[in-house]
Amino acid sequence: MGKLNIYEEASRCLLCQDAPCTKACKTGDPARAIRAIRFDNHKPALRWVKECSDADLEHAQQACIHYNWPIRIKEILRSIHPDDVDDSHYPDLTITFCGIRCENPFFLASSAVCTNYEMVANAFDAGWAGVFYKTICLQEIKEVSPRFDAMHNNATHGDFYGFRNMEQLSENTVEMDFDILRRLKQNYPTKVVVASIMGQKEEEWVMLAKMAEEAGCDAVELNFSCPQMKHKGMGSDVGQSPELVKAYTACVKRSVKIPVISKMTPNITHITEPAAACVEAGADAISAINTIKSVTMAPDAEVTGRRTVSGYSGRAVRPIALRHILELVKMPEKTELSGIGGIETWRDALEFIQLGCNNVQVCTAVMQYGYRIIDDLILGLQRYMVKRSVSELSQLVGERVPLFMNPDGLDRDSIIYPKVDRERCVGCGRCYVSCMDGGHQAIDFNTDTRQPRIVGTKCVGCHLCRLVCPTGAIIPTKRIAKK
């Protein structure tokens, strides 16, 4: 089984709670090993099954409750080579954000994943470094049902690439929420507790910020970006006005001594305009992005026959979030950044860090897979640092920013031709179809041998064929000068 198929098969795993496969295996934890592969840590996966015999893994496979057919646990794990990274010298992931020590860069984003004491405490116990607690306001919050829907992958119903929500802010009383934050900070003094707040006028912003400071919070986040607020003058409507966000940031900065973080909306043409206004008003950091306004005709998005605009998140929004982060990091008004948007694996988080974020916030992936994903977020980032011989996480912050330039600065005098790997090719012809109908008609397809052939004189190196190939049989060659 090749590497591609290892991931493909592991992606079928249901990621069960109290996994039957592990209960059936007396010598290891195959469920944890499969989860490591699922979240982009395939090489260290063997550490959880190093004592397992073939018979143990066969018992685990027989116990699998997948609704189609059992995950091929033994075949997956026996296909993995031993880890090439020494796990006895993993670096710690300590980093500072707004002058606050964070034990790692991974925070819960203000959302449904952190709405009460027990949830946040469980996340802290699991290894999350901090929380941007669900946004607190003075208005009464009433939610709709249902309020979530998703864009599913075809293969697995429970796995989705895009997620939509109509949820607003905390339904708790203000007093209840700040008591929760006070207890969290008292009981978890090494964790970072950030109060996310939202007001309708200056007096409300000031009042809530002072309550956050009095509760012992490490910082306060000003939510200028929720896209589905029922109340006027709140959420992303405010975030689109540089004048308003500047005024609200300034009044909070005058009122408290703890760091102030302004949260930006992506539902705007130039995110740098309100962000710069916040920095000018004294904001200590910018967090971005919140969810993207969206609509769908899916049945799950309907409430008694009616629909509304709601917020879109998940893996699909990550490239959009990264683009906003790039714009923010290039602002003349320099500030620290907290990255949000589509983070699911350690590689996703690394992209935000390399574009200038000192920490990252996660929501949708936690809603899908639980707080336990922190294990692989930490493990993957540590292994990456070892392989790069990087001793401190701060060395990675912003290191990829210089790679980005305007389109006119890119090399247009060279080309990378694709090549067909005959061993992997199954002759489906998908590359031919896409190149004929969406490319440059640079692939011939022999219907007798079912073999595609790339025509070099027509190929422009767009790589559409490589992207649509379901078996990974089309690979890039070396870059050469155009003829």
Q: Which residue stretches match the model-derived regions?
A:
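Alpha/beta enzyme core
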Residues: 121-126, 200-338, 344-351, 355-359, ...
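Immediate flanking context of iron-sulfur cluster ligation sites
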Residues: 2-19, 42-63, 415-419, 423, ...
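Short, charged low-complexity linear segments at domain edges
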Residues: 1-9, 27-50, 396-417, 430-451
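C-terminal helical cap(s) of enzyme catalytic domains, especially alpha/beta-barrels
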Residues: 143-156, 297-311, 365-390
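Iron-sulfur-cluster electron-transfer modules
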Residues: 34-107, 111-114, 128-129
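Iron-sulfur cluster-binding cysteine motifs and their immediate structural context
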Residues: 15-39, 55-79, 352, 430-448, ...
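Alpha/beta catalytic cores of nucleotide-metabolism and tRNA/nucleoside-modifying enzymes
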Residues: 1-3, 76-90, 313-327, 332-334, ...
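N-terminal capping/small domains of soluble enzymes
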Residues: 83-193, 199-203
